Amino acid sequence: VGALAETVSDTAEAPLVNTTSASLGALVDAQAVSDLPLNGRNFIDLTFLQPGIGRQENMTSGGTFVGSWYSSNGAPVRSNSYMIDGTAMVNVLGGSSGSMANTTLGIEGIQEWRVITNTLSAEYGMTMGSQMTIVTKSGTNRFHGSLFEYLRNSVFDARNFFDVRTDVTPDRLPPFKRNNFGGSVGGPLKRDNLFFFFTYEGLRERLGITSIANTIPAQCRQEPLPADGTCRFDGDRTIAPLIKPLLAQFPLPNLPDNRVTFPFTQPTQEDFYQGRLDWNISPSDTAFGRLTQDETTQVRPLGFPGFITDRLSRNQYLTVSETHIFTPTLLNTARMSYSSTKLNLTSPALVSGPEYDFVPGRGMGLVNI
């Protein structure tokens, strides 16, 4: 006869009512952070799970190193604060830390994530909106880690309205491939005394884009310019020599109404690194140091073939902290941080010559073609 056993598991849960603070918000632990599906593994999207948080799509559509923008209880989008291990993590425009890929990677290294939407306590400041705080993972006496890769492509995607099939764009829709991969490892450097935790995450994306734009009619590229109203000119029906090299950069129409379409693959490469060291100096002294770096490169089209921008973003955040316990009721934490953001946008010169250079102190003027 088989034995019958009964097991009772008691799992600690957060109290439904907070009797020690008037703050409103929510805590997401490491298990929930790991289990919740996130498009692009952008952990800032966890914010939108909270009541009172609204996404500002008009701020994110450009996708240019602005991170994620949201409004908390109707407050302006620049009224939110972001902290990692107790130090600021804000981009140059006032939003969350983000890259040229418009993502904030590093979810594999997050131990705890919290957002406070109202009634901030005295330890926070500088904001009238919400307060996001992130605690990174640290090593333990046991080695542990993870490996992952996520693949997304266009096999099951639907064609949107602008993906028009032409001789130039014969495919059903532009190709799209995204690979998110990486891992983490942590453990002891000296048992019970010194620990490490390292995280790497990579993003490789090839985003197909169908561009549709108005271009210059073929009749307006030949001299003399037609007088049927197709081309605008002031008396002289010739094309200025200075304009001809610029005119040659614009493609001929391949759609009705002087429109042009062409396919373009926008490549993006992002690499995220984060390392943390924890040191138990003595029973009354602990310290840690963490370095976070994210570097992204992207090539983005500007409406016509050959018109592109090479984009680079590099974010670096360093935190060093030491905590000393004087008495059971008195302790002090000394913390130092450093942050740096590098942004670089360059476009190749399609025409050359001093007549096309911008002179400092002189207006750019207006070119009519």
Regions found by a protein language model. Name each.
Residues 1-369:
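Short acidic-glycine motifs
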